[in-house]
Structures are given as C-alpha cells and as structure tokens.
C-alpha cells in the first residue's frame, strides 16, 4: 500500500518533535501536525515560563543580600509588563528553535488540528486527508479540575 508518509506525528511538543526528528534521521518521510505552538506545554505555558518567573523573583533578595558585600543597590523596582514581554520573547525564541529543528531535519509540518479517521488515515482541520504507515499520538495531556479545599488558589498550565 502507498502512503503519504512513513511516519506522521500528531502533536508538536517535546515528545512529538523528538520522535519526528529521529524518524527523519532514520531516513523516513515524516509529517507532523500541531494545532497550537511548537514546544508543547513545557515550553509554551509550563516549565519554561515557571522557571523564568522563579528566576525573576529571586533578584529582589539577591539585591538585598549584595549590600552586605559592598554593592550599593538603591531604588530597585519590578515592572511586570517588562517581565511579561521578556518572557514572551524567550518563549517565541524557543518555539522557533523547535520549528527550525523540524525543518532542518526534513519534517513536513502542518499548523493544524489532526484527527484519526481510520487505519493509517488522518484528517486535518483543513479537510486534507493524509495517510501514513505509522502514526504517533503525542498530544500530551490536560490538567484535571481540582476539587480539593483551596483549589480556587491553584494555577494550572491551562
């Protein structure tokens, strides 16, 4: 049977991107569909933004501590809008690296939602039907709604 791709990945997060690059490096014709942004939860709205927030939040105490070691740090302040802009710039940079890695490895990318419609068949939200010998589902997950006491104060990746 003839297929459009040897391997097609649904999901452009860390797992999907890695699978696509490895399959392509093994000589396979590879396609990947991502409906949101390349990089997945970790890069776009999870690990990376959290680490940037933690990094920025540590400066206040570091400024105070530095005064005991000869530094003269006066009138420090934090500008939330500048932080948000810088965080978004870093996430954009990382997303571009994920995308560039796919392109450099010869992976055909689709900025689309993909859905299985049968054995070896996928339909994109553009109504394009794609066939693939192998299909990898790398769609990640979603946090569940929390029902514990104090849940209204919790923040999820979504």
What are these regions (language model features)?
Residues 1-13:
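Beta1/beta-strand and adjacent pyrophosphate-binding region of the FAD-binding site
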Residues 2-5, 21-28, 33-158:
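Glycine-rich flavin
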Residues 16-17:
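N-terminal Rossmann-fold NAD(P) dinucleotide-binding loop
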């Amino acid at each position: 049977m003839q297929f459009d791709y040897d391997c097609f990945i649904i999901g452009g997060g860390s797992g999907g991107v890695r699978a696509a690059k490895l399959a392509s490096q093994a000589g396979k014709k590879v396609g990947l569909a991502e409906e949101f942004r390349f990089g997945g939860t970790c890069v776009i709205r999870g690990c990376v933004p959290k680490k940037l927030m933690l990094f920025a939040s540590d400066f206040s105490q570091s400024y105070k501590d530095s005064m005991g070691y000869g530094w003269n740090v006066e009138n420090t302040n934090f500008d939330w809008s500048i932080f948000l802009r810088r965080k978004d710039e870093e996430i954009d940079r990382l997303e571009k690296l994920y995308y560039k890695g796919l392109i450099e490895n010869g992976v055909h990318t689709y900025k689309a939602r993909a859905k299985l419609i049968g054995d070896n068949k996928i339909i994109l939200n553009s109504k394009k039907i794609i066939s693939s010998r192998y299909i990898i589902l790398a769609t990640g997950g979603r946090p569940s709604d929390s029902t514990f006491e104090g849940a209204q104060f919790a923040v999820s990746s979504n």
